[in-house]
Amino acid sequence: MATIKDVAKLAAVSTTTVSHVINKTRFVAEATQKRVWEAVEELNYAPSAVARSLKCNTTRTIGMLVTQSFNPFFAEVMHGVENYCYKQGYTLFMCNTEGDLEKQKHYLRMLAEKRVDGLLVMCSDLNEQLLTLLEKNTELPMVIMDWGPDSPRTDKIIDNSEEGGYLATKHLIENGHTHIACITGQADKVTCKERVRGFERAHIDANLTFNPEWILEGDFECASASRAVDKILAIEENKRPTALFCFNDIMALAAISKIQQSGLRVPEDISVIGYDNIELSAYFSPPLTTIHQPKRRVGKTAVEILLERIKDKDHERRVFEMQPEVVTRSSVSNRLK
């Protein structure tokens, strides 16, 4: 394996000059730079990250804990994170926890051993034990989605779930739907509680009552949505909901599929609105009306905030608040026409 001395010898310069060229820390004549880079390429030289981290007290690496990398919402957020890390010269260690506490502990320990400069936590499955582990890492710059711990040393991203739930339900009501069901995620999750509050507030503002039995608990996965739709379809036709609000797009798409398999039509018989605006939602049949969240922008902003915290651990706490909005497509019928 080539060393910096090998590069210096081939380029006929000092090791100090090679270091300045590679790290861009001092002006070096263009002709000299050319010789150095040609030597680097010929020898396939890679600077030692370990040596650099010891010298600069930084590894230029960021860790990321995520619930499920295959979930389209998290996948799009991760795309924004990875892309911006790359542009800023940082390497990303992505750790898929799958809700497993032992994996969470292992990854946190591994990231600490790797001496990452900062940590992004985008887990929807944070529990008290993991929160305790995170709170022990007081020296590690951290950005956490808003279901995480509230700490003056931790920057946060708030997804404004209550407003999103309100907008989704309000859109259905404005289209003449007064009998609305919803399929939530796990009832104990903060985001789900907030979206339910938004669902309820929209009914109150419209002077409508809602049926608590039509708030059906799912788990953000397809199978749970399918089971919930079975319960809705079991209701007598003239008494069943005319619209369904699903707490993420994956469940909404599964619900549409189940409704159509039963011989009913979306949106003519039952309207469906989702949440997240994942890329697939625009290409389903019918295209899904949903609540948009700026996922790639969230990823980019999370890294921006984290890099600020890495540079200045004492800077004022930052909170980035997402602004949900309705994206109207073809899965909601207008019953007022």
Swiss-Prot record:
Keyword Isomerase among UniProt keywords: no
One GO biological process term: negative regulation of DNA-templated transcription
Pathway: Purine metabolism; purine nucleotide biosynthesis [regulation]
Residue range(s) of DNA binding per entry: 4-23, 48-56
InterPro entries: HTH_LacI, LacI/GalR-like_sensor, Lambda_DNA-bd_dom_sf, Peripla_BP_I, Tscrpt_reg_HTH_PurR
GO molecular function: DNA-binding transcription factor activity; transcription cis-regulatory region binding
HAMAP family linked: HTH_type_PurR
Record's comment describing the protein's domains: Consists of two structural and functional domains: an N-terminal DNA-binding domain, approximately the first 60 residues, and a larger C-terminal domain, approximately 280 residues, which imparts the function of corepressor binding and oligomerization.
Protein name (Swiss-Prot/TrEMBL): HTH-type transcriptional repressor PurR
Naturally occurring in which organism (per UniProt): Aliivibrio fischeri (strain ATCC 700601 / ES114) (Vibrio fischeri)
